[in-house]
Amino acid sequence: MTVYLLAGGGTAGHVNPLLAVADELRAREPGSTILVLGTREGLESRLVPARGYELLTIARLPFPRRPNGAAVRFAPAFTRAVGQIRRMIAERGVDVVVGFGGYAAAPAYLAARRSGVPVVVHEANASPGLANRLGARVATAVGITFPGTALGPRAEVVGMPLRREIATLDRDAVRDAARAELGLDADRPTLLVTGGSTGARSLNRTVVQVAERITATGAQILHIVGGAQEFTDPGVERYHVVGYSDRMELAIAAADLVVSRAGAGALSELTAVGIPAVYVPYPVGNGEQAVNVRGVVAAGGGIVVADADFTPDWVLAHVVPLLSDPAALARMSEAAASVGTRDGAARMADLVRDAVASRPSRPAVRR
């Protein structure tokens, strides 16, 4: 039976597609062995074992961004990580390494290459990260979420691998049950606010300032503030605050409108289910979130606003009227669904299994 090593993690944006592909591979080949490579600090340390997969860990190795002491220490630490992963590959008889970006992916790509094991890469964002740019150079196959992502001639659009709970979600059928389970009223317009697995301080700060004025219109708010954020619940009626949700499918099903960052994972989940959204791209980094959101905004399924412009006045002028306009929300829902995809996990699993099948035989490990 096949032994798969899936590498990636850190945030939900890396962990969720990894788990989606793992679930798809397990469903297709129940006797296979699926190992996950990550770090002890990442979200994978909790979610991977909870999903029933074995987690192997290496030290967290951020790529150095400037020539300093950390850069000097990086090279030997990276070399040690590659060696550690090569031993894992040999000892566990790994047949293919599948990388999703993040701290664990880059050394896994090199370890696989040096061990003669095929590499398959999935890139979630429109603008690829450093690890996956490296991985694409040695990969047998590359799956991308957005058309136009620059990862070489082997790149193929597969969409975002989504967890089965999202990919099979019938929003209309489960909305009332989802609201009941979350403690929400069944018939009120519902705004979901989420900044991703680590939260979004500026979104949190703005929404809490206008929560009472939003709920005064008769709406209700489910606000996922993120486990890493310091936040005080103001105690406003119909303003429901939680730190982190392991059941995002319930939160999504309950929502009429979402305010969210524009990470590829969140965006792909919302468009797959056809949820209208206000996207506030993360203003730091390489700008990939602003690129991610272009397609859904052009289709009419979302609104984009810069982080600096996402103020209480902006929310009152744009979010509140939209939340109370069912016809506009219905049009946005249809447009969002037109750019979403639900079968990314299946498409990605096809690439992985093709890579395994095309491998002629297990070569000797190069020392």
Curated annotation (Swiss-Prot):
<keyword id="KW-0961">Cell wall biogenesis/degradation</keyword>
<keyword id="KW-0328">Glycosyltransferase</keyword>
<dbReference type="InterPro" id="IPR004276">
    <property type="entry name" value="GlycoTrans_28_N"/>
</dbReference>
<dbReference type="Pfam" id="PF04101">
    <property type="entry name" value="Glyco_tran_28_C"/>
</dbReference>
<feature type="binding site">
    <location>
        <position position="163"/>
    </location>
    <ligand>
        <name>UDP-N-acetyl-alpha-D-glucosamine</name>
    </ligand>
</feature>
<dbReference type="GO" id="GO:0051301">
    <property type="term" value="P:cell division"/>
</dbReference>
<dbReference type="GO" id="GO:0005886">
    <property type="term" value="C:plasma membrane"/>
</dbReference>
<dbReference type="GO" id="GO:0009252">
    <property type="term" value="P:peptidoglycan biosynthetic process"/>
</dbReference>
<keyword id="KW-0132">Cell division</keyword>
<keyword id="KW-0573">Peptidoglycan synthesis</keyword>
<comment type="pathway">
    <text>Cell wall biogenesis; peptidoglycan biosynthesis.</text>
</comment>
<dbReference type="GO" id="GO:0005975">
    <property type="term" value="P:carbohydrate metabolic process"/>
</dbReference>
<dbReference type="GO" id="GO:0008360">
    <property type="term" value="P:regulation of cell shape"/>
</dbReference>
<dbReference type="GO" id="GO:0051991">
    <property type="term" value="F:UDP-N-acetyl-D-glucosamine:N-acetylmuramoyl-L-alanyl-D-glutamyl-meso-2,6-diaminopimelyl-D-alanyl-D-alanine-diphosphoundecaprenol 4-beta-N-acetylglucosaminlytransferase activity"/>
</dbReference>
<keyword id="KW-0133">Cell shape</keyword>
<keyword id="KW-1003">Cell membrane</keyword>
<protein>
    <recommendedName>
        <fullName>UDP-N-acetylglucosamine--N-acetylmuramyl-(pentapeptide) pyrophosphoryl-undecaprenol N-acetylglucosamine transferase</fullName>
        <ecNumber>2.4.1.227</ecNumber>
    </recommendedName>
</protein>
<dbReference type="GO" id="GO:0071555">
    <property type="term" value="P:cell wall organization"/>
</dbReference>
<dbReference type="InterPro" id="IPR006009">
    <property type="entry name" value="GlcNAc_MurG"/>
</dbReference>
<feature type="binding site">
    <location>
        <begin position="11"/>
        <end position="13"/>
    </location>
    <ligand>
        <name>UDP-N-acetyl-alpha-D-glucosamine</name>
    </ligand>
</feature>
<feature type="binding site">
    <location>
        <position position="197"/>
    </location>
    <ligand>
        <name>UDP-N-acetyl-alpha-D-glucosamine</name>
    </ligand>
</feature>
<keyword id="KW-0808">Transferase</keyword>
<dbReference type="GO" id="GO:0050511">
    <property type="term" value="F:undecaprenyldiphospho-muramoylpentapeptide beta-N-acetylglucosaminyltransferase activity"/>
</dbReference>
<comment type="similarity">
    <text>Belongs to the glycosyltransferase 28 family. MurG subfamily.</text>
</comment>
<feature type="binding site">
    <location>
        <position position="289"/>
    </location>
    <ligand>
        <name>UDP-N-acetyl-alpha-D-glucosamine</name>
    </ligand>
</feature>
<comment type="function">
    <text>Cell wall formation. Catalyzes the transfer of a GlcNAc subunit on undecaprenyl-pyrophosphoryl-MurNAc-pentapeptide (lipid intermediate I) to form undecaprenyl-pyrophosphoryl-MurNAc-(pentapeptide)GlcNAc (lipid intermediate II).</text>
</comment>
<keyword id="KW-0131">Cell cycle</keyword>
<keyword id="KW-0472">Membrane</keyword>
<dbReference type="Pfam" id="PF03033">
    <property type="entry name" value="Glyco_transf_28"/>
</dbReference>
<dbReference type="GO" id="GO:0030259">
    <property type="term" value="P:lipid glycosylation"/>
</dbReference>
<feature type="binding site">
    <location>
        <position position="125"/>
    </location>
    <ligand>
        <name>UDP-N-acetyl-alpha-D-glucosamine</name>
    </ligand>
</feature>
<dbReference type="InterPro" id="IPR007235">
    <property type="entry name" value="Glyco_trans_28_C"/>
</dbReference>
